[in-house]
Amino acid sequence: MDSSLEQHRLEINENREHWRRKPVLRRVYAQFYRDIAARINPANPGFVVELGSGMGNVKEHIPHCITTDVFPNPWLDRVENAYGLTFGDQTVGHLILFDVWHHLRYPGEALREFSRVLVQRGRLVIFEPAMGFLGRYVFGTFHHEPLGLENDIEWTGGEDFRPDKAGYYAAQGNASRIFTGEEFKSCLRDWEIKEIKHYSGLAYLASGGFRGPQLYPTVLLPFFNSVDSLLSKFSSLSSRMLVVLDKK
């Protein structure tokens, strides 16, 4: 196994232990997953598939979702590579990417593959870091993955591109750059942006995530959610974003 993928596998196992020990983290993520589940269109035929499922938590909220990752785990349904999916043409109704988009070195290659497997008007639901003030400061200062805001985004991998050779990649700012800026609008012409929702994510950030210290008692989560609701009205403060794309 590639060393970067092995590191990712080890991180998932560590995260499972943190997940077990931090009830507030489970509750915060449940809120995010409920928002994702609310974007599932029951009129769409085809499978509901999550790519990069990690711990497979999506099944608590979308039980029929097919969970996948780039390596096998006993709690996941199958192994999939976003650049070369094993699903047939137009067999998938929804694709869910939770903290996966910023790991796609060549987003254009992935979107081409997503378009192949999605039914007409099939839906892509993406949940990502956002580059408002809180996102830039917290993720840029305390997170081990780079924001990548100053780096060029390589839309495609070129004529010799192979799905299994993309390698590890991370740039947490890519979703904000691609979906809220002007630079990549022409690259998204085959997709309709149905929704972009920003979250301040304060309850999540102050929970410490998987590795940081929890900065408030779990009993105060409703208070932090109330503050979140107010701050989330201002995308300039956001640390999280939900993007919904429909295939044209």
Task: Go through the PLM ranges and name each one.
Residues G84-D89:
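Short conserved loop adjoining the S-adenosyl-L-methionine
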Residues K165-E183:
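Acceptor-substrate binding/catalytic loop of class I
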Residues M1-Y83, M241:
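Conserved N-terminal segment of class I S-adenosyl-L-methionine
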Residues G108-R123:
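A short glycine-rich, Lys/Arg-flanked "PGG" loop and its adjoining helix->strand segment in the class I
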Residues E182-S186, K194-K248:
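A C-terminal cap/extension of S-adenosyl-L-methionine-dependent methyltransferases
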Residues I96:
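A conserved beta-strand element that flanks and buttresses the S-adenosyl-L-methionine
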Residues L124-R162:
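Conserved class I S-adenosyl-L-methionine
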Residues D99-V100:
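Short catalytic micro-motifs in class I SAM-dependent methyltransferases
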